[in-house]
Amino acid sequence: MKHVDTEIPTEEQIHEAEKFGFHGQVQAAKIRFDRYFPGVLASITVAAAATFLSDHYGAPTMLFALLIGMAFRFLSEDESRALVGIQFASTTVLRIGVALLGMRITLGQIQSLGVKPVVMVFFSVLLTILFGLALSKMMGRGKRFGVLTGGSVGICGASAALAIAAVLPQDEYSERNTIFTVISITALSTLAMIAYPVVAQWFGLDHQAAGIFLGGTIHDVAQVVGAGYSVSEQTGDTATVIKLLRVSMLVPVVFILSLIFHKRNQKDGNAPRRTLLPPFIIFFVLFVGINSLGVVPKPATQFINDVSRWCLVTAIGALGMKTSLKSLFEVGWKPVSIMIAETVFLAVLVLGSVVWMS
């Protein structure tokens, strides 16, 4: 049988090729392509399959991407040619997707809400993170897990989990905790999409108040849209704007976390792992500003939003391929309890605020 060379191109090969002028640059580009293509293609294929299933069967796209990705975990084994590309998709592609989320938000949308909803969103996010931090520490799961889950529940679900995980210090449990958070937040968000409109009706909330409640509590954007427009068009519009305001809280939260861990690294005498404000958050703010100017045509904005969604689903698929079911089963009941408690805490806090404002 003929031997097939499966050697993965290395960074040393790339740097060596770059020394030989234009021809070397072309050769280096080819080596990079060979290095990343198998894993990126596998991740995009998982994303495409997840999108197809979601469009035809209605379940959350990210949940499908995770489950399909985990079925192909063998592609991320140490000797696999796809490993480097999968790592690229789970990090760089992820950051691109988060940065492009800024094209969903305008400053005008935030201004149109008035002061009270903005203050409510700010304190609900802050208090949910602090609650998660305290509860996680009390239950022996550590501060990082509390920040990760609290931020995910308080801000924007799976997207926030990925963005926050990107700036937290990494350890042997980081990827497992991120995947667990994404799976749990997707399940809780789906349940909230079904249950929270009924809760709004029970409390007799009008269309605007119901929109504030749904947008301020449901975890992922897609489920907010689904729940809001199932009540009324006004409720859907209000819920979407409130939700996007929560998405914008990614910027200060990620900046503060980066600042905290930057100072901690300096105190410990270690070189800082990241800049104070990661580039993908800088671009997030930049895209919010560009979108606020109204200079980007709507078809282009929609295209960018689609690219963002594809990047995030691709990254989730890659993370799934790097995660084993065994490691998830080892998490235990405490993390599940923490995330349920955070979800209930946020719902009660926002509902109380909405009733008070009404």
UniProtKB/Swiss-Prot annotation:
The chain crosses the membrane at residues 36-53, 57-76, 83-105, 115-134, 146-168, 178-200, 244-261, 276-295, 307-325, 335-357. It comes from the Bacteria. GO terms for cellular component: plasma membrane. The keyword Transmembrane helix applies. It is found in: Cell membrane. Its main location: membrane. Pfam families: Cons_hypoth698 (PF03601). It is a multi-pass membrane protein. Keywords: Cell membrane, Membrane, Transmembrane, Transmembrane helix. Belongs to the UPF0324 family. This is UPF0324 membrane protein CT0845. It comes from Chlorobaculum tepidum (strain ATCC 49652 / DSM 12025 / NBRC 103806 / TLS) (Chlorobium tepidum). The lineage of its organism: Bacteria, Pseudomonadati, Chlorobiota, Chlorobiia, Chlorobiales.
